[in-house]
Design a protein with these regions (language model features):
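An acidic-aromatic substrate-binding cleft motif
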Residues: 101-154
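Aromatic-lined substrate-binding rim segments of carbohydrate-active enzymes
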Residues: 152-202, 276-285, 291, 295
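Carbohydrate-binding surface patches
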Residues: 458-520, 557-561
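Active-site neighborhood of glycoside hydrolase catalytic domains
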Residues: 236-325, 329-352
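The substrate-binding groove and active-site-proximal loops of carbohydrate-active enzymes
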Residues: 116-129, 159-176, 226-243, 271-285, ...
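Active-site-adjacent "subsite" loops/lids of carbohydrate-active enzymes
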Residues: 111-117, 123-128, 195-255
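C-terminal beta-strand-rich structural cap/linker in extracellular carbohydrate-active enzymes
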Residues: 543-566
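Aromatic/acidic polysaccharide-binding cleft in carbohydrate-active enzymes
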Residues: 264, 353-450
Length: 566
C-alpha cells in the first residue's frame, strides 16, 4: 500500500465554510468556521477576503499546516462600520501561487436580528439530546431568529405544573428540558429565540373556570377556534390580558427567550364581552403590543413580533413597537402580485422596519398523494421565496431539518428533497449577502419605463412591472445612496400567478441582452444559482439613443442587476 505521490498536487477540498453566527455588529470582527479535507500533510496559504458586491473591502492571510484528513479552522476579519449591510466572504487556499480550493459564504453586519429577521421555527421538543445539532443545522440558512412553536403546557399557563415531560393541549409530547436546551443552543449559534405566545385565547378548562373572560358573537355564541381554543377578553386591565403579559414575562425570565411571537387568528374582527361591551380587536392590539414590549424590555435585546393574519390589522399596529412587521397571508391574497402589494404597503407604513411574510405551500402537502407533482410543489416554495426576497421581504416557510411549512399548524411541515432544500438555501444565503440591496427599508421604487429584454436570437421577451405569469417580472429600486437595483424574476413558463400551486421549474437562460435607460457602468449582476451568487461585471454594447444594452450572465429563476459605485 502506497501513499499519495509527493510530487503531485495535494487533493484538497473545502467541505464547509460559514460564519460562526449569522450576523455581527458593524465595525466588529466576524468569525468564519471552515472545514478542510486534504489527503496529505501540506503547508498552504489561506486568504480570506470580505466582499462588498465584487469589491474587496477587507483581507487577511494566514499560513496553515494541514494534516491528512479533516481539519476545522476559525478565521476572523473586521467588518466595516456601515450599518445594516451584507457581505460575501471568500476563502482561497493556495500552494506555490496556485489556487487549490475556494469557498464562499455570506455574513450580515447588523445592530440586531430585527434588522434582518430571517425567520424559522422549531416544532419538536420531545427530547433535548438532539436539540443542539438541530439548531446548528440552521446555520447554512443564515437564520437569525427562531420561533419555538407550541412549546408551552397550555395557552393560559406556559410552564407545566408537573415535573418533566408533559402533553400539550393537542396531545404532543413536550420536554421543558428540550425547550431550554433549544434556547441555549440558539444563543450559542447567535440566533434569537422567540416564544410562541397566543393572543387569541385559552383552552376550554380555563374558560369553564373563568366564564366572564370569554367573548361572544352577536348571537351570544362563545367565539372559539374549532371548539378547542376560546377567544378571550383583551381589554386593558382585564384578567386575561394581565395573565397573558405575566406569561410572556415568565417565558423570557424562566426559559431565557429573547422575546415573544404574539399570534392572532385574524377573523373575527369584532366581539362582545360577557358584560355586553362591543369592541374591535384592532383597537386593542396596539396597546397590547406596547404593553408586551414594555414588559419584556427589562433586558436589552428582548423584542416582540405580532402576527397580522391576512394582513389584519396592519395599519392599526404599524407604529406599535414590534421588532419587525409580520404578515401571514391567506386568501384572497393568492397571487404573486398580492404578496408584493402587501410588502409594499408594509414598507409604506412600517417606520423603516423589516417585513416578514408567512405564506405556506399547501400544494406541497397535497403533492404527497400525487408523487409526480412533488417537484412542482417544491418549486412553488423556491419561487415564492424568490418573489418575496426580490420584493424586499423575508419568507417564513422554514421549519427544522429542511422542512417547509404547509399550513398554519407548524408541526405538519414536510421535508424538502435535498436538491430543493439546496436551491432554497442558496436563495436565503443570497438574501443575506445582498440584504442592503433587497430588503433595505429605505429603498425607493424606481420606474421600469423603457427597459427592453431580448433573448440570444434577438427576440423580445415579455416583461412586466408586476409578477405576472408569462412574463419576466421587473422590480426596480434606488438605494439611499442613489444606486439603481433591478430584479428580474422569470415567470414565463408559469401558466398562472397563484403562489400556492404546483409550478414549472424555469429553464436556465443564456445570452439575454437588456437595455437599461439611465443605468450607468460599471454594472454587475448575480443570481443565487449561478457561481454561488458571485457578481459578474456586465459587458455593454454600443450606446444608442435608447441607452446601453448589456449582456446578462447565465441565470435561472432570478437575477439581480446593480449599479456599482461610480
Amino acid at each position: 500500500m502506497t501513499g499519495p505521490d509527493p510530487r503531485s498536487a495535494p487533493r484538497l477540498a473545502i467541505r464547509s465554510v460559514e460564519p460562526a453566527r449569522p450576523w455581527f455588529r458593524p465595525g466588529r470582527p466576524a468569525s468564519l468556521l471552515v472545514e478542510i479535507e486534504v489527503d496529505r500533510s501540506v503547508l498552504v496559504s489561506a486568504r480570506l477576503e470580505l466582499l462588498d458586491l465584487d469589491q474587496v473591502v477587507g483581507s487577511v492571510s494566514h499560513r496553515l499546516r494541514l494534516r491528512p484528513g479533516r481539519t476545522r479552522r476559525r478565521f476572523r476579519i473586521m467588518l466595516p462600520t456601515v450599518p445594516r449591510h451584507g457581505y460575501g466572504l471568500r476563502l482561497t487556499l493556495e500552494r506555490g501561487g496556485a489556487a487549490l480550493a475556494c469557498g464562499t459564504c455570506a455574513v450580515e453586519a447588523l445592530a440586531g436580528w430585527w434588522e434582518s429577521p430571517r425567520h424559522a421555527v422549531l416544532t419538536d421538543f420531545r427530547a433535548s439530546r438532539w436539540m443542539a445539532a438541530t439548531v446548528r443545522r440552521f446555520a447554512p440558512w443564515h437564520v437569525t431568529v427562531v420561533q419555538f412553536y407550541d412549546w408551552m403546557y397550555r395557552h393560559y399557563r406556559y410552564a407545566s405544573p408537573h415535573d418533566g415531560t408533559f402533553r400539550d393541549a393537542l396531545g404532543r409530547r413536550v420536554s421543558p428540558a428540550a425547550v431550554r436546551e433549544g434556547v441555549r443552543s440558539c444563543h450559542q449559534s447567535g440566533i434569537a429565540a422567540l416564544a410562541y405566545g397566543s393572543v387569541y385565547g385559552a383552552e376550554r378548562e380555563y374558560v369553564d373556570a373563568h366564564p366572564d373572560e370569554r367573548v361572544f358573537d352577536e348571537a351570544g355564541v362563545p367565539l372559539s377556534l374549532g371548539d378547542t381554543f376560546f377567544l378571550t377578553d383583551l381589554r386593558p386591565r382585564s384578567p386575561w390580558r394581565r395573565r397573558l403579559l405575566r406569561e410572556y414575562a415568565g417565558a423570557c425570565r424562566d426559559f431565557g427567550f429573547d422575546g415573544v411571537h404574539m399570534d392572532t387568528y385574524g377573523q373575527p374582527h369584532h366581539a362582545v364581552t360577557a358584560d355586553g361591551t362591543r369592541f374591535r380587536f384592532e383597537d386593542l392590539y396596539p396597546g397590547l403590543i406596547e404593553e408586551a414590549a414594555g414588559r419584556l424590555a427589562s433586558r436589552a435585546g428582548r423584542r416582540v413580533l405580532f402576527n397580522c393574519v391576512a394582513g389584519y390589522p396592519l395599519d392599526a399596529v404599524a407604529r406599535s413597537p414590534a421588532a419587525a412587521l409580520y404578515l401571514e397571508l391567506w386568501p384572497p391574497a393568492v397571487r404573486y402580485r398580492d404578496v408584493v402589494a402587501w410588502i409594499e404597503h408594509a414598507r409604506r407604513v412600517g417606520a423603516n422596519r423589516a417585513i416578514v411574510i408567512a405564506a405556506y405551500i399547501s400544494a406541497l402537502r397535497d403533492s404527497w398523494a400525487v408523487p409526480d407533482q412533488r417537484p412542482g410543489a417544491e418549486e412553488a416554495v423556491i419561487l415564492l421565496s424568490s418573489v418575496i426576497a426580490a420584493g424586499g421581504g423575508y419568507h417564513q416557510i422554514l421549519a427544522e431539518d429542511g422542512r417547509a411549512l404547509v399550513e398554519g399548524y407548524y408541526p405538519a411541515a414536510l421535508a424538502l428533497s435535498q436538491s430543493s432544500a439546496r436551491e432554497l438555501r442558496s436563495a436565503w444565503r443570497f438574501g443575506a449577502r445582498y440584504l442592503h440591496l433587497l430588503s433595505e427599508p429605505q429603498l425607493s421604487p424606481a420606474p421600469c419605463d423603457g427597459i427592453e429584454l431580448r433573448d440570444a436570437q434577438g427576440r423580445p421577451i415579455p416583461v412586466s412591472p408586476q409578477p405576472d405569469a408569462g412574463h419576466v417580472w421587473l422590480r426596480a429600486a434606488r438605494t439611499p445612496k442613489g444606486l439603481r437595483v433591478l430584479s428580474l424574476v422569470d415567470l414565463r413558463d408559469q401558466r398562472d400567478d397563484r403562489w400556492d400551486a404546483v409550478r414549472q421549474r424555469p429553464a436556465t437562460v443564456t445570452g439575454w441582452r437588456i437595455r437599461l435607460p439611465g443605468f450607468r457602468p460599471p454594472l454587475v449582476a448575480m443570481s443565487p444559482w449561478t457561481a454561488h451568487g458571485e457578481p459578474a461585471q456586465l459587458r455593454a454594447g454600443r450606446a444608442t439613443s435608447e441607452g446601453l444594452a448589456w449582456t446578462l450572465p447565465r441565470f435561472r429563476r432570478w437575477l439581480l442587476a446593480v449599479e456599482r459605485t461610480h
